[in-house]
Amino acid sequence: MKLISPPVRRTATAPATAPGARLGWLDALRGIAALIVALHHFDVLRMLPFGGAVWRNFDMGLFGVMLFFIVSGYIIPASLERRGDVRAFWIGRIFRIYPALIAAFVLSILMLPAGDGSVALLRTGDDLASLVANGLMLQDLLGVINGMNVTWTLCYEMVFYFLVTALFTRGLHRHSAPIAAALAGLALAVGTAVGTQLISAELGSTRQLLLIVTPLVLAGLAGVLSGRPVLTGTGALLLGGVGLFLITLNSRAPAFETWMIFATMFAGTVVYRAQHGQLARLPALLSCGFVVVAGVLVGWLYNHGEALDRTWSSGWKAWSVGYLAAWALFGVGFLLRGRRFPRVLTWLGAISFSVYLLHIPLLRTIEPLVGVPPQPSSVLGRIAWTALFLGVVLAVSHLMYRLVEMPMQRLGRRVQKAADRRWPSAAHPAPAASTAPAETVPTEAAPAEAVRVLSGPPRTGG
């Protein structure tokens, strides 16, 4: 379903910066975040003499999560609006995420030692519910344990796709600034007043929720993939409504964290719109500034007591400093966006989704082979162990990227073209035309890679 025409390429004022430099800063940020993710789960802080102090005052996990969410918010709406084709956007998303996710599940199950719980896809007591919820990528919002320890953030990413698509089809996609500010205000106002997982309190209610949500989501996806304006709009509203319902009443994360995740993603969109002249700088600065301040304040106000069991952080300082640091690094990357970044960082950004999916299964596979735990006691031993872990993760992730991600993305483009030939999208008047030059719209990225652990029993400590 094409809602807007592709923006006309501007030739009179072509940017002087090379394309690689324009997008290199985003790849570099994803690469840095992926490295932080891997080292966080590697428990690198336990090997440092000052690691305890860092853990108490800086949450590496939250830092990585929020940095990925900011980047995702910057990129995802732009990739949808680039051609104004909802079906093309969703086909692209499906072929970017699911092949790598399925391959990671299969590879992990094959290589993990017996008894390891890193993959819980078929170990939840209800295999069908686990497969369906994880297949929809909504398990963390349906009360179902994540099939893989780190996939909880893909649920919030998926709901972001739902919301962005719904806003786009209604012509409301340019209202990113008030949406981001409103969500941040909601996080501040609600805090922990609204409980978590209010619907799926036990297995029976979880199954009932699945029976309701699954056909609604499938119907919504069928609509947005139809290429028909009415069906696309209806499907998008259905997906947006389901997503909003789930994050409001059945999120595993505390309300303040849930709403801040979405405020952060929409604030990333605000940055993109301000950069490309779709939004004045003052409202953009006010909106993003309020989101950043709210992110720091919600940690101070609410990240205490029982909330720590669901945010998996050591305290409010760790949450607030980690959140602020994510925005600080994004800001540095944004200021340096016209420069060329080291190739190793852009390469790391390219393979970051595979790094995210595979680093824990690879860690659990390597550990018994080298006799860890316990951690090496000598400095040289710790350096060697860290180098071995990173070397294996990066090598296997590179292979996954080349052998799975890239071919499947190419297949997705062929499927999209075939769908356009077989079922041409009907023309639809544009809700609002894009003003960004075509060559400055960033390409789609992998979903927001993240670092938290299991959706079921909360993890305590570092």
What are these regions (language model features)?
Residues L23-G24, A53-V65, V144-Y156, G195-L216, ...:
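Interfacial loop-to-helix transition and helix-capping segments at the boundaries
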Residues I97, L101-F162, G185-S200, W319-F330:
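Membrane-interface helix-loop-helix regions
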